[in-house]
Amino acid sequence: MTEEIAGFQTSPKAQVQAAFEEIARRSMHALSFLHPSMPVYVSDFTLFEGQWTGCVITPWMLSAVIFPGPDQLWPLRKVSEKIGLQLPYGTMTFTVGELDGVSQYLSCSLMSPLSHSMSIEEGQRLTDDCARMILSLPVTNPDVPHAGRRALLFGRRSGENA
């Protein structure tokens, strides 16, 4: 077995879609918590810092996923290993997974199980929105007063004498 995983030169969307559809068909179809009508849907992937980043919804979950990008070599990791990553959205904990015939990847559960009241269109829109959100820069209000570092350290509020 190789010690490194080669990246995808182009988006792995089609391979990821096919792999999750096979999992759904082969081993997940009889579980009671499955969304009864949600198909597998994979958002478009975006290259972020050399890695393919996107989201996938299945009848059993919605997850953010990361696959190795062009010219990347990932070390082979233990499936189920946890890795914290800093994305523009914030720090997220990912779990190493492996899709047969695709590669190892990183996955962060965003929703599981899915609400049975969610329509297919809502699920697909949510998947696309989540893919954009995890790579969106956080927005803050510059007019909100911030306590200085010294005030935080010594328990003083702005406006008090130092």
Curated annotation (Swiss-Prot):
The uppermost taxa in this organism's lineage are: Bacteria, Pseudomonadati, Pseudomonadota, Gammaproteobacteria, Enterobacterales
User: Which family is it part of?
Assistant: Belongs to the HupJ family.
Matches recorded under Pfam families: NiFe-hyd_HybE
Q: Tell me the protein's name.
A: Hydrogenase-2 operon protein HybE
